[in-house]
């Protein structure tokens, strides 16, 4: 890891240092994904079967995982694993239950009632990657808010064979449909539907470059599906002072670096001593990792930054806007009001990022690659939609009419104006009729 003294860098050098590597999808990936999507759209289940055999080397008897298979997977799982997953489920559920919005109803002026109501997205799709290790934590992070939000149908796709842990969590989250489909073909199947796979309104979940590109393409097609957020490499930034434990910091940096060679890890500290100690601790701990080669590649583009104060550390962090932000200082909560841009913040020596990744209760699906400036961590709101309601009485419209008419005239929208005045004229005539009856 490079050690840099912040004050020794020019403004342009500081900007360059904190720039992330460009994410580029080759034309070959774009073309390949377009071909996969078209195959699924045109051939449905048959196309999915063919693509699964081509890319996964598997010919499943059925695309859909049966309830019997899910129960069998649950039976095979150890009690230790079930207990861990249930504890994580409980904590994540508690945090997301607390996010339920309250209805809004306001009388903005006499006779004018405005409301905001929240409804679940009708159908959602969850993509869970395959790979060398199962990711039941991702099922929890996606399945629980979908369940609490009340989405009417939840579809899960994962490359075959689907791990027992994933199927068990799908059962915990009461996911409606589980399919043996991976890659871009899974995204296409959920976005457009097939004979077996239900079309969904929004797709959630991480994946490789092909999955990411497929999500981008279907989200740009009005016939496709919305997606959760832009994707990017995993990253962590640690703010630490002289009170921090360098071994803890090193472990936190490495826990992010082992995700992949494109992961970004950054330490910002006012203490040169801590920077040196962390560099030594990283090297020691690296040798103990099964994914040492991957972590070492990530560390090659990562940074140790020595700032002149904690205030400057905060400024650097806010400019960078990390996915994960760990604050290991003497009084970490004092810095919290100063922190503007981060996906998830971990305060204090005993709040490792791993806790949030798995079981503290917060969601581990987070904006990365600088998107923390405009995107938030995944939550209940992402599985919901807001609708506004307004109801005006006759007197309410009378009171509001002059404002609406004046603004419609200013914008040259005669029909907008007429929609109000025709009602006011009708009300005036009714008033005249009432007066005549009463005379």
UniProtKB/Swiss-Prot annotation:
HAMAP family: HisD. The keyword Cytoplasm does not apply. GO terms for molecular function: histidinol dehydrogenase activity; NAD binding; zinc ion binding. Its EC number is 1.1.1.23. Catalyzes the sequential NAD-dependent oxidations of L-histidinol to L-histidinaldehyde and then to L-histidine. This is Histidinol dehydrogenase. Pathway: Amino-acid biosynthesis; L-histidine biosynthesis; L-histidine from 5-phospho-alpha-D-ribose 1-diphosphate: step 9/9. It comes from the Bacteria. Substrate binds at residues 234, 256, 259, 324, 357, 411, 416. It catalyses: L-histidinol + 2 NAD(+) + H2O = L-histidine + 2 NADH + 3 H(+). Belongs to the histidinol dehydrogenase family. NAD(+) binds at residues 127, 185, 208. GO terms for biological process: L-histidine biosynthetic process. Coiled coil: none annotated. The active site is at 323 (proton acceptor), 324 (proton acceptor). It comes from Aliivibrio fischeri (strain ATCC 700601 / ES114). Keywords: Amino-acid biosynthesis, Histidine biosynthesis, Metal-binding, NAD, Oxidoreductase, Zinc. SUPFAM superfamilies: ALDH-like (SSF53720). Binds 1 zinc ion per subunit. Its cofactor is Zn(2+). GO terms for cellular component: cytosol. Zn(2+) binds at residues 256, 259, 357, 416. CDD domains: Histidinol_dh.
């Amino acid at each position: 890891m490079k050690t840099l003294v912040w004050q020794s860098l020019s403004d342009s050098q500081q900007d360059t240092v904190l720039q992330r590597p460009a994410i580029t999808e080759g034309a070959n990936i774009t073309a390949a994904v377009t071909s996969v999507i078209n195959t699924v759209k045109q051939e449905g289940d048959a196309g999915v079967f063919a693509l699964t055999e081509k890319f996964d080397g598997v010919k499943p008897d059925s695309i859909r995982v049966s309830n019997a298979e899910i129960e069998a997977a649950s039976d095979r799982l150890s009690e230790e694993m079930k207990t861990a997953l249930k504890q994580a489920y409980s904590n994540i559920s508690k945090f997301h239950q607390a996010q339920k919005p309250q209805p809004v109803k306001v009388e903005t002026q006499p006779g004018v009632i405005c409301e905001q109501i929240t409804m679940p997205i009708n159908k959602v799709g969850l993509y869970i990657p395959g790979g060398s290790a199962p990711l039941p934590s991702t099922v929890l992070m996606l399945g629980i808010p979908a369940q609490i939000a009340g989405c009417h149908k939840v579809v899960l796709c994962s490359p075959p064979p689907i791990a027992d842990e994933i199927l068990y969590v799908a059962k915990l989250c009461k996911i409606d449909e589980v399919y043996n489909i991976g890659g871009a073909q899974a995204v296409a199947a959920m976005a457009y539907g097939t004979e077996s796979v239900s079309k969904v309104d929004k797709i959630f979940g991480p994946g490789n470059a092909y999955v990411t590109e497929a999500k981008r393409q279907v989200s740009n097609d009005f016939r496709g599906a919305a997606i959760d957020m832009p994707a990017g490499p995993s990253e962590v930034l640690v703010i630490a002072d002289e009170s921090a434990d360098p071994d803890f910091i090193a472990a936190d940096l490495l826990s992010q670096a082992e995700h992949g060679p494109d992961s970004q890890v950054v330490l910002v500290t006012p203490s040169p001593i801590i920077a040196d100690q962390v560099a030594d601790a990283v090297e020691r701990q690296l040798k103990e990792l099964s994914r040492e080669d991957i972590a070492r590649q990530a560390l090659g583009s990562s940074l140790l930054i020595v700032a002149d104060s904690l205030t400057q550390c905060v400024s650097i962090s806010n400019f960078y806007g990390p996915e994960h932000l760990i604050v290991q200082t003497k009084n970490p909560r004092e810095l919290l009001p100063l922190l503007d841009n981060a996906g998830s913040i971990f305060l204090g020596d005993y709040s490792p990022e791993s806790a949030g990744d798995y079981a503290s209760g917060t969601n581990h699906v987070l904006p990365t690659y600088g998107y923390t400036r405009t995107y938030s961590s995944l939550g209940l709101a992402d599985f919901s939609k807001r609708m506004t309601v307004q109801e005006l009485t006759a007197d309410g419209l009378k009171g509001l009419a002059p404002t609406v008419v004046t603004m419609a005239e200013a914008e040259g929208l005669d029909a907008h104006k007429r929609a109000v005045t025709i009602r006011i004229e009708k009300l005036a005539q009714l008033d005249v009729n009432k007066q005549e009856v009463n005379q």
